[in-house]
Every structure is written in structure tokens, then in C-alpha cells.
Amino acid sequence: MTSSPDSWVYGDYAPDPTKRDLPGMKARWLLEQLPAASNPLVLDYGVGEGKHLHLVRMARPKARLLGVDVREPHSPKYFEFRKVASNEPLPFDTDTFDLVISFDVLEHAEDIERSLDEIHRVLRHGGSFVGFVPAEGGLGPYAFFRLLDPDIYRDTKDHNHAYTRRELCGHFSSRFKIVRLEYSYHFIGAMLDAVFFASFKMPIFGPKLERFWRGQENNYYRQHASQATRRSVVGGLVQFASRVAYYESTLLNKCPLGAKGVHFHLTKL
């Protein structure tokens, strides 16, 4: 885990799994991988404000929910929180959790090896580790923009690492059994995402675009915000781009070729 600006926190709402966009796709992935038990002990590694735990809570009302992050949430109403510094050992006993989830977090980690070791330690034998991580390394649009500015996505997305799919699978398989992998952010989705965040560096329009994305106007990830988002031109473009990327990812979700997003379900043996 690593710190990021408070404006990147999108609240304690649950993402809508019925929406035909990329956040909805991630939400459905989580729900599909939940254990059958009605009262699992669940840890969110990099919990933020708890939107994915909220989703778990809606599906498993009896679950006990805990979250860790480098920054305290504004209002953890329905989960127990532990503040943990980056690369600090998790404050839990070995073989504790039935399920660990982590969405869009490992790319921010200072040391993915240590992060995965700790997740493996606190997960009970037979427990599941479920989440999503970008795989922006290797050839593709992200590599092109990194040729122009090696730190472009560290500056605009707070991504400390650009993993390849092979690297991620190596990290996973050395600790866990891979149960299921699916893929997203393929050719069109990756290009749109890479261009969008690279645009933050443009001299005139870039700062305005970045303020929109990180500021209070950005309702894109909120559960019922599609109409509010479309009221601005930029918001409409973001909505359109996500819809296009969603349909591409849905069509190619079993195809790793060109994919820059990995949805994973792992178990501890």
C-alpha cells in the first residue's frame, strides 16, 4: 500500500454491479468469487473508504469486515479499521481470514513481494484472495507514453509499478493456487485509459482535466451518478470511453492478449 491524495477517495458507497462499465465489471467479479459461507471473516487490503466491503456487506450481511490502509477513512461505519504503514506487517494472526480482497492496490505497493507475503500469511488455508490489478507493463500504449516521460503514470495515477501479466502470474503462483483469471482493459480500453491520464500533462487543458477527475465534480464512480456525470462534456466522454472499454472487455474477458487489467481469484494451499 502507499498513500495517495485524499481527492482520490470516492466515498463509502458500493459500486453498482449492474452497470455496464468497468467499475461494474469489477463489482460483479467480486460478487461471483465470494465464498458460500454466510459469515466469512473478510479483509480488504487497501480499503480506502470501504466501497468494496460495502458490496460484500450487501451480499453477506453476517460477514465480519475489516480493512487496512495507510490513511484512515473518513467514516468507517460498517467495518473495523487498522491503519498500517506501507510495508508494515499486518496486525493480524497467521491463518485468520476466510477472504482477502484488494482492488487497484498492488500497483501502488512499494514492495509487492512483501505485500503478497503478508496477505498469504493472514489468509487461512483454503481461503481466497480476490481482486484486480493493472498490468500496464510490456508493449502497448502505456509504454509509449512512458518513453516520453518515465514517471508519467507515477505522477498522474500514483502507480509505482507497471507489471506485465507474466510478472503478476509469477508473483501469484509462487504463493497461491490460481483458481481463475479474467482480463480487461484490452486494446481500446488500454489506449483510452493511457491517453486520458497522459493528458493530465498537457500544458493548458491537462490541469483542468485533472481537477475534474480528482475534484468534487467527479461523480463517475458514485453508484447513481451517470446522469450527473454526463452534464459536463468531459464527464460524458469519460462515460462513453468506459462503456466502450466495458463491451470490449466483456467480449475478450478470457483473452490475455493485449489485456492490461487482471482480475484474479487465488487460494492459499
Question: What does each of the following model-derived ranges do?
Answer:
Residues 1-93, 99-103, 116, 145-147, ...:
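Conserved N-terminal segment of class I S-adenosyl-L-methionine
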Residues 73, 108, 136-139:
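Active-site loop signature of alpha/beta-hydrolase-fold enzymes
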Residues 3-21, 113-118, 128-267:
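S-adenosyl-L-methionine-dependent methyltransferase catalytic module, highlighting the catalytic core
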Residues 91-93, 110, 164:
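GHKL-family ATP-binding catalytic core of two-component histidine kinases
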Residues 109-110, 123-125:
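Helix-to-beta-strand junctions that scaffold the AdoMet/dcAdoMet cofactor pocket
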